């Protein structure tokens, strides 16, 4: 990354945090960093619903009389007070130094004193201010001259689990337009399937209300039902399930792992880890599933290793809760054979430098990386730039509805246009194993 080599130095003049509203109507932190030359960087911090136990701490006020306990006034105050005083005058171009100072200032392993939501807002806003000072888009500033790869999008079109009020145990069913030639074409293909699926669900008597991430949330009970609807929509749109558009699932298995087993409440069955793995392997065999996120629970490491041995050569197995964007946890996963891919959510770890280190470690091991949103999002499009900057080749940023999701797609469409002839679309090659 080239972010530490910016000249001339651009000193931070002011740091200002405020409370804004996320896509679920909950408060979140937004930070402005202004440099001495007037350059502005602004970043809004996302929030998750299904969170890993090892995530950095999102500081909430926990005052039940305001915002139902979800206020962020303490985090905002930390930014406007202690953090601003600490970073004022620092060189915004020294991202690693700035983030190290933020981590030291907090002084806790999980960033629980000041809050990861406070630290991340400053970290990202400083990077964007430094990019503005250099008159570069963020992807170019962070990624250098070689940043030209547009990511394969994982498009969430059916929601379940913690993201929807329906019986589906699995949290997300996604499509990936592996046969597209450009990012813009991938968006078109995804949008067409999304609207076909809407018509199909209506015709079958299902609701077409959407979940937190913009996918439909019909009252389906099994993964097979959801996958059948998605495959039919792909084919009715005129595409081939598999060669043109692959399938991705996120069971979010930690959410229904209880006392050593997997409780499928929607189906009304309980599966042992071995039975759960058998079920997933059966779905891979029966449908063109190219990737599964969190197939096993974060505390079921034996299950993770066994599933990786069993299907890891033909399916991307992406760790979210099990790694929480933590480089040390990813290194351990690489060493012990837990998965073959990592989901990167910058707010899980709390600084840009740490997130980029996780990406680098995964790439060095030959693992794939998926840049990801959270279920509670804003109009902030930073992750779109990060996907291009890192060349990770995959992005997960929700459905083809809700402007908090489509903002990221639109940003990537603009980046592809800006890159012109140098733009490359990752396509199927991003998955490597499929």
Swiss-Prot record:
Source organism of this protein record: Streptomyces coelicolor (strain ATCC BAA-471 / A3(2) / M145)
Keyword Cytoplasm: yes
InterPro entries assigned: Enolase, Enolase-like_C_sf, Enolase-like_N, Enolase_C, Enolase_CS, Enolase_N
Catalytic activity: (2R)-2-phosphoglycerate = phosphoenolpyruvate + H2O
Binding locations of (2R)-2-phosphoglycerate: 171, 345, 374-375, 396
Family: Belongs to the enolase family.
SUPFAM superfamilies: Enolase C-terminal domain-like (SSF51604), Enolase N-terminal domain-like (SSF54826)
Cell membrane among keywords: no
Predominant place of localization: cytoplasm
Domain of life: Bacteria
PANTHER family named among the record's database cross-references: ENOLASE
UniProt KW keywords: Cytoplasm, Glycolysis, Lyase, Magnesium, Metal-binding, Secreted
EC number per UniProt: 4.2.1.11
Residues given in the record as Mg(2+) binding sites: 250, 293, 320
List of catalytic residues: 213 (proton donor), 345 (proton acceptor)
Entry protein name: Enolase 2
An annotated GO cellular component: extracellular region
Any one GO BP annotation for this protein: glycolytic process
SMART domains: Enolase_C, Enolase_N
Localisation: Cytoplasm; Secreted; Cell surface
Entry cofactors: Mg(2+)
GO function terms (MF aspect): magnesium ion binding; phosphopyruvate hydratase activity
Cofactor remark from the record: Binds a second Mg(2+) ion via substrate during catalysis.
Gene: eno2
NCBIfam families: eno (TIGR01060)
Function per UniProt: Catalyzes the reversible conversion of 2-phosphoglycerate (2-PG) into phosphoenolpyruvate (PEP). It is essential for the degradation of carbohydrates via glycolysis.
Associated pathway: Carbohydrate degradation; glycolysis; pyruvate from D-glyceraldehyde 3-phosphate: step 4/5
């Amino acid at each position: 990354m080239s972010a530490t080599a910016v000249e001339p130095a651009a000193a931070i003049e002011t740091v200002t945090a405020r409370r804004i509203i996320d896509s679920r109507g909950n408060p979140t932190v937004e930070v402005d960093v202004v440099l001495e030359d007037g350059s502005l960087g602004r970043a809004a911090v996302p929030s998750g619903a299904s969170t890993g136990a090892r995530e950095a701490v999102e500081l909430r006020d926990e005052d039940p009389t305001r915002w139902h306990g979800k206020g962020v006034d303490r985090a905002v105050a930390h930014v406007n007070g202690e953090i601003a005083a600490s970073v004022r005058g620092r060189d915004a171009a020294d991202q690693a130094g700035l983030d190290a100072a933020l981590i030291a200032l907090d002084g806790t392993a999980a960033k629980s004193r000041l809050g990861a939501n406070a630290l991340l807002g400053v970290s990202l806003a400083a990077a964007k201010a430094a990019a503005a000072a250099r008159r570069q888009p963020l992807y170019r500033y962070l990624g250098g001259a070689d940043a030209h790869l547009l990511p394969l999008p994982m498009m969430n079109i059916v929601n379940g689990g913690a993201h929807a009020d329906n019986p589906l145990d699995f949290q997300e069913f996604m499509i990936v337009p592996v046969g597209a030639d450009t990012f813009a074409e991938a968006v078109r293909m995804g949008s067409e399937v999304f609207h076909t699926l809407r018509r199909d669900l209506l015709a079958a008597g299902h609701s077409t209300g959407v979940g937190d991430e913009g996918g439909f949330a019909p009252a389906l009970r099994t993964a097979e039902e959801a996958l059948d609807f998605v495959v039919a929509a792909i084919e009715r749109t005129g595409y081939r399930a598999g060669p043109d558009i692959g399938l991705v699932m996120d069971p979010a298995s930690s959410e229904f792992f209880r006392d050593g087993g997997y409780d499928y409440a929607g189906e009304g069955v309980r599966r042992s880890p071995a039975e759960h793995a058998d079920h997933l392997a059966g779905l891979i065999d029966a449908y063109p599933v190219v990737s599964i996120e969190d197939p096993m629970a974060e505390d079921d490491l034996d299950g993770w290793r066994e599933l990786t041995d069993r299907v890891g050569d033909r399916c991307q197995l992406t760790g979210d809760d099990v790694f929480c964007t933590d480089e040390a946890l990813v290194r351990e996963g690489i060493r012990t054979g837990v998965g073959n891919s990592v989901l990167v959510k910058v707010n899980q770890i709390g600084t840009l430098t740490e997130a980029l280190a996780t990406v680098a470690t995964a790439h060095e091991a030959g693992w794939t990386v998926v840049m990801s949103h959270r279920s509670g999002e804003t109009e902030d499009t930073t992750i779109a730039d990060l996907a291009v900057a890192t060349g990770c080749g995959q992005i997960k940023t929700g459905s083809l509805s809700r402007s908090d999701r489509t903002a990221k797609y639109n940003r990537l469409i603009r980046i592809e246009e800006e890159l012109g002839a140098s733009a490359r679309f990752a396509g199927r090659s991003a998955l490597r194993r499929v």
